C-alpha cells in the first residue's frame, strides 16, 4: 500500500544552483568516486557541466613547494618578511590559485582535498599510534623499541609548529636513502592511492599491521620524497597542513566558497559549483540535499517563565525528551544500499554505524515501510545499557558503537552497552524536501514510514501540549527518569537549517550551585609559576551582524521556503573574563606550551593593542594574540559578581570555582564563546535567582538549627516582633561572621534570609544599587572587596548588628562594637549609645555575653597569629563550603563507608542533611545504594518540579567517587562525569 504519493516516485530531486549542476555522473551520493584509474577518478565529465582541467595533473611535490612550504616559512619566520604576515600569506595563496587557473584549469578539487585533509570526506582510520607502529614495522624495528616509544610520546618535547610527521620523516631519513624514481607522483595519483587506502581501511580488520602491509601506503613510502612524505602523513592523520589555510584558500578561490562550504560540508561540491569567481551565490541557492551534511536546526534556551514559554509557542507544541548524546543525521539512499551518518559539524561517522542495511551497529536495524527509496532522518545517538536497561551518560556513544562493530565482526565478547538511535525528525523523503513542512506533518510522515527496532532504533515522540502545567509535568517526569531535560517544539514551526531560534526551546533542570554552561574561552594571558595560571577571554562581536531573533508576537515561522545563510558574527576584540589553573593536567600544560611556544610577549615590555586585546586591572606577565592561542572548555560553579572583582576583568564579572574540562582542538579564536552568549547564559541562570530572591527565606528555611534566646533586661521577649521592621532598607553583605555565642559560622546566605524575613531588601549587585539612600553594607572580613569599599568612603557595619536586630525584633542603634569601618560622624553617634565602661544602653547583659567577652581576647589572638594569608589558604581547602549534602545509602552493614564519605565532606567544609529538599547535591555511596532507592530520590525531585510552575532548582545526583575526585584535585570537578545511574 502506498501511504503517500511520492513514496513510489523515483525521480531524482533537482537542486537549484547557479547555472551549474552539482551532481556528477561518475560520483556516488557520498562524494566518493566510483572505480576508474587513479588519474581518471578525479577527472570530471564534460557532459554534466562541471569544470575540466586542460592540463595534466601537476606533481604532488609542486603543490608542496608552491603552497605548503611557502606558507610554513612565513609561519616560522618572525621577522624579515618585509610585510605583515597576513599580507604575505594572502600573496602566496592568491599566486597559487592564479597559477592553477592559468596552468591547470578550473577544477581545483584534487588540490583542495589534499590541502584541507580534515575536511576530506574520506576516512582512513589512522591515528598517531597506528601510524607510528606501522612505520616502525615498515622499518623492521622490534616492538616497544626506543624509537617507537620516542615517537609515541612526541608531544612532550615537540616545539610549536612541529607535528608528528616531522619526527616520522626524521626516523626514515636515519635508516634509508631518499627514493629515486623516474617520475614523481602526480596530485591525481596521490588521491588515487588515498582512495585505495580508504577502501582497505574499511574492509576487514584494520590495525597498524594492516597499514604497514597496505599496498597503497607502501607505494607512497617508496615513491615520495621526504618533503612529500611529511605532508602525506599529515593528510593521512587528517591534521591541518598549515594553520588557517582553509579560510584563506577557499576565499582566494571564490568569494562565496567559505560560506558555501559551511552549508554543504563537501569540498567537491564547493569546487565544482563555484569555479567561476564572477558567478556569485544567492540566498535561495542553499538547501538540504541527500547525501551531504548540513547544519541542523538547534533549540534555544530561554529565560522566561513557563507560562510565557507556552505563549511563545502558540500554546500548541510537542514535548520531547532531551537525549544526552551526539546529534546525528542519517541519509538513507537507494533503498538502503547506501547509508551515511553525519554529526552536527559534518563529521562522517558512517564507519561506526554501517554504510548499508546489511552491516553496522545501526544500519542493519534501520527499517522502513515498502516504497521508501531515500530519506533524511534527524536524531540523537546515545548509549544504551542492555543489562541495566537505561541510557548511559554522554561520552560512551562512539566507544559503544566501536565495541558493537568489533563484536559483530569478530564474534568476541558482546559489550553490555551499544548505540541507540533516537529519531525525532524527517527532513527529506523520496526526492521531496520536507523542511518547509511544519512539525505536525513531519512527525506524521515519520511515524508512517519508520519501523522502530527495540533498543536500537527508537522513535522519539512526545505529547502535544498547550499549557505551562504540561511543561512542568514533563520536566518532572524527565528528572525522575534521569534525563537531561526536555525540548519543546512549536507545532507549526518549520525546520530552519543552521539556525537556533525559539520555535524549538530546550529546558534543562536548574541545578543548585551550578552556572550550568560550558564555555569555550580563548587564552590571552599567562602567569608562569609552579602551576601556570591562564587568563581567558570572551569575544566581543559586532551586534549588527547577528541574525535578528524572532519577535515575541510573531514566533519564528517564516512564509519563505528559502534556507537561511549562516553568518558568523564579526569579532571586534577580546576582553579578559577569568583566570584558569584548575583542571589542567601536566600533559595538557605541556600541550598548551607546545601549541603556543614563541608567541608570548612580556606584558610590561610590549602591551597588547587595546582595540584587539583588553585586560582589566588584573594583567598577566605574558600575553598572546588570540589568533595564535588555544581554546579551553571551561565550567564554573557560579558567576562571581563581587564588587572587588568587577574591575579585575574587563567583562565586569567573572566565574567562581572555574576549571578547565579539556583543550578544544576543534575550536579557534573565531569560534570561541562571545560576550553575547555569556550574557544570554547569565540571564537564563539569573531568572531563577531573581524569582527566588523575592521569597528568600520564606520557602526555603536555613539548614542550620535556629538559636533559642533567653533574654534578661529591658526588652520584653514575650512581645511579638514586627515582621517588616526592615521594610524600605537595603542590605549588601560582603561576608558572614563567626558567632561567639553559638560557636558557629553565620554565612552571607543566612544573613540574606534574615533580611528578607524582616521585610528588608537583599541586593546582590552593589554597582547598580550604590545610590540608594537607606543602604547598609555589612561585612567584617578583610577582603579586597571590603578594602575597595572603604577606600570609596562607604561605612561598613558588622553583620552581627543585623542578626541582633532580628534577634530583638527591632531596628537597633549602631554601637561601636557593630562598626567595622565608619566615618568620624557615625562613630561619634555610635559612642553615644554606650556608657563610659563600654556597656550598651539598649542591650541587656547576659551570661552568654559575659562568656563571649571573656573569650574574645583568645579568639582575636589566635586569628592574628594565623595571619591573613594562612586564613585564606585554609579557606581555599574548604572546597565544599556552603554545600549541603544528602547521602544516599540503604545498606546498613556498609555504614562505615558512609561515615567515611560524611567525614570527607565535613572535613572540606560541607554539611550533611537528612532533608532531601534542603540538599545542594545528592551523594550515592558507591556500592551502597540500590536502583530502587535511586529512583525514589529521582521521583521525589521530579515531583518537586511538577508541583510548581516556577523554575525549581534541584540537586544533582553523583556517586561518592565525585567527593574523592574533588578532594584529590582540590577543586570541584565536573559532576556529570560521576553521575549516579
Curated annotation (Swiss-Prot):
Please tell me where this protein is predominantly located: nucleus
Can you give the residue ranges of the BRCT domain? 721-819, 875-980
Provide this UniProt record's keywords sorted from A to Z.
ATP-binding, DNA damage, DNA recombination, DNA repair, Ligase, Magnesium, Metal-binding, Nucleotide-binding, Nucleus, Repeat
The reply to whether Nucleus figures as a keyword in the UniProt entry is: yes
An example of a GO molecular function for this protein is: DNA ligase (ATP) activity
List locations, semicolon-separated: Nucleus
Show the catalytic activity.
Answer: ATP + (deoxyribonucleotide)n-3'-hydroxyl + 5'-phospho-(deoxyribonucleotide)m = (deoxyribonucleotide)n+m + AMP + diphosphate
**What is one GO biological process annotated to this record?**
maintenance of rDNA
Q: Which domain of life is it from?
A: Eukaryota
Q: Which Gene3D superfamilies match?
A: BRCT domain, DNA ligase, ATP-dependent, N-terminal domain, DNA ligase/mRNA capping enzyme, Nucleic acid-binding proteins
Name it: DNA ligase 4
Q: Which gene encodes it?
A: LIG4
